[in-house]
Each structure stands twice: as C-alpha cells, then as structure tokens.
C-alpha cells in the first residue's frame, strides 16, 4: 500500500489534510522455476509488477517442495532444467488435485512446433519462447485465469 496526502490551508484558517491511499491488488501467489537465476529474477519481477506475490525455485525438485508447502495460483516454469525437467514437473503438479486447474506457463528456449505440443501434453496451458516478452507472459496468465 502507498499513501499520499494533499494539504491545504488558508491564512488564519484550519489546515485540511486529504489522504489518498493506493492499494496494490494482489492477484495471488506465483511460483517461478528456472535454473538460471537471472531469468528467475526477471520473471519474478514481471509477476510482482503485475501484482503477484512470488516465490522462486531453481530446480523442479525445489519447486515441488515449494508446491507442497503452500498453494500457488500460477506456475511459470522453464522446460530445459537438469535432472527433472519442466515437463516432468508439470505432470507431477497436474496429478495433485490442488494444481489440476491453475494456470501453468512454460517459458523455454525450445521453439519448434512439436515443443508446443509436448508442453500442452505435459499440462502447461501456454508455451512461451525465450527471450520472454513481459506483456505476453502477463497476457497469457490473464487469458488462462478468465
């Protein structure tokens, strides 16, 4: 929340203060997963700017731990991570009742036509290619949620 105040006073008169409050709407909790810390932070910043409270993970197993510890309203994940990849993460999350219908967006360097199909089959709602356009990411999440 932020606040500002307009102050006015006439000579010899009372001072009037009119506070203005701006509440930032929290759109929910988002989990960002990428093995590259710079990309993780960039994606987190985009989602924070869009009104989300963001948690980050740098591997699929860490993301699963986070998802078991609290419920997220949206998951944005890289695909090409060492060990357990993003497709495997999506499949495990979609098997959990609380994650069956939340928006899940794949963000990846894999940009061939069949990569999009693999992402959908794994459980992602959208497949966005890197470099990520912040507007495209937030629009994709909005489309899924509405």
Segments the model singles out, each with a brief description of its role:
Residues 1-31, 44, 135-146:
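Non-catalytic signal-transmission and effector/linker regions of two-component phosphorelay proteins
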Residues 36-40:
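Short acidic/polar segment at the start of the alpha1 helix of CheY-like receiver
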Residues 41-49:
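Charged docking surfaces used in two-component/phosphorelay signaling
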Residues 51-58, 66, 128:
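Short hydrophobic/Thr-rich beta-strand motif most characteristic of the beta2 strand and flanking loop
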Residues 70-76:
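Active-site beta3 strand of CheY-like receiver
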Residues 81:
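Receiver (REC) domain active-site loop signature in two-component systems and cognate sites
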